[in-house]
Design a protein with these regions (language model features):
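Weak global preference for isoleucine
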Residues: 8-9, 29, 90-91, 128, ...
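Glycine-rich anion/phosphate-binding loop at the beta-strand->alpha-helix junction
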Residues: 55-142
Length: 180
């Protein structure tokens, strides 16, 4: 989800446990936006704020989306542009604001997460996936690890990817652990 972008970037900026925070270099992070939701990148207040704060080195709009610092025809070109033109150490690729879903197993824009991971792998990157986890969504299919994450990562992704599973307490934590 586009709304996860600031949290993902905040996590990427945190030093590792064994690093001295004062000595840990901050990675150069670029945002690549797919065309699975709103097409104008300027609709994203998150990207604007992250760039203003210096947390993003730039943005790339891909496919039919537009309005990034750079624009690319495909996810693959967008990833390459972020790495080689913007000089990113880390690239976060999500759809833009807004979501499309049909309440069917395959009818949601988030299945495109698999395409992003596959593209990163094809380009010899290190695919890392972010889970959609919630206990606030009343829809059962989104309780714990959302069926969006489960479908995209276990059924549509054709490569290996790192996926961080949060360690949570209580009954909800047990649910997430069992789903992972």
């Amino acid at each position: 989800l586009h709304s996860a972008l600031p949290a993902i970037i905040a996590g990427a900026r945190c030093p590792l446990v064994d690093e001295d925070p004062s000595q840990a270099p901050l990675p150069k992070i670029a945002y690549v936006m797919s065309d699975g939701a709103a097409l104008p990148l300027p609709y994203s207040r998150s990207v604007f704020g992250l760039k203003q704060a210096g947390w993003l080195v730039g943005s790339v709009a891909t496919g039919q989306s537009w309005g990034g610092d750079l624009e690319a025809v495909s996810l693959h070109n967008g990833l390459l542009a972020a790495r080689h033109v913007l000089g990113a150490d880390i690239i976060v690729l999500t759809q833009g604001p807004g979501n499309l879903g049909s309440d069917t197993p395959w009818g949601f824009s988030g299945v495109a997460c698999a395409d992003a991971l596959n593209a990163a792998a094809v380009l010899a990157g290190e695919p890392i996936a972010a889970l959609r986890v919630s206990q606030a969504d009343a829809r059962v299919r989104h309780l714990g690890i959302s069926h969006h994450s489960l479908t995209a990562y276990s059924r549509a992704t054709l490569c290996s990817a790192l996926i961080a599973v949060p360690e949570l307490d209580g009954e909800f934590g047990e649910l997430v652990k069992s789903q992972a």
